């Protein structure tokens, strides 16, 4: 599968079976995450792999069925004290987290593991549950697993190239 086929295949899955993610697939996904670039190579992220009881405790943090069904969830945190800031003090932590998250969801798609990129959750409750240090902010949740067989993948609706690209000479 080439890269375009991979990005066309990947979608946000919100329902999961109880089937666990194979350890070798998770290892591959995490190796791909490790290779993600970051501003000035700061790598201001940490990845928490949640399964079992701690995953059940996440249910109130993101109140959708996703956490009740997904057999695993990754929590991607960013450390704003470690991230690069450009000359005007713009913090690139969230940008770096987006890059590592995209590496994760695409590597998962390559292995046939379904994911959903979640940012709308109770950040403080997540931080408390995981007992994170003050400088570490939970930025992304990635429920992971396998879609039920009856899942219909929705058609992707994207703007035309002409709407998003301008050539300047």
Name what the model sees in each region.
Residues 67-73, 132-153:
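A glycine-rich helix N-cap at a beta->alpha junction
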Residues 46, 121, 140:
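Residue-level "edge-of-site" marker
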Residues 106-109:
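Short hydrophobic alpha-helices that are characteristic scaffold elements of the AMP-binding
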Residues 25-31, 35-100:
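Glycine/small-residue-rich phosphate/adenosyl-binding loop
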Residues 3-20, 25, 140-169:
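C-terminal helix-cap and adjacent tail motif
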Residues 78, 120-121, 146:
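Short secondary-structure boundary segments
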Residues 113-125:
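GST superfamily/GST-like fold recognition
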């Amino acid at each position: 599968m080439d890269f375009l086929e991979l990005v066309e295949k990947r979608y946000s899955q919100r329902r999961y079976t109880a089937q666990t993610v194979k350890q070798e697939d998770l290892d591959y996904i995490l190796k791909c995450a490790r290779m993600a670039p970051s501003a000035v190579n700061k790598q201001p992220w940490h990845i928490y792999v949640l399964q079992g009881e701690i995953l059940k405790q996440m249910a109130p943090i993101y109140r959708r069925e996703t956490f009740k069904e997904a057999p695993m969830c990754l929590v991607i945190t960013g450390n704003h004290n470690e991230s690069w800031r450009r000359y005007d003090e713009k913090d690139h932590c969230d940008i770096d987290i987006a890059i590592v998250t995209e590496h994760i969801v695409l590597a998962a798609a390559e292995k046939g593991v379904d994911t959903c990129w979640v940012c709308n959750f109770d950040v403080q409750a997540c931080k408390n549950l995981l007992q994170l240090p003050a400088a570490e902010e939970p930025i992304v949740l990635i429920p992971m697993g396998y879609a039920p067989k009856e899942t219909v993948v929705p058609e992707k609706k994207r703007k035309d190239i002409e709407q998003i690209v301008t050539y300047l000479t």
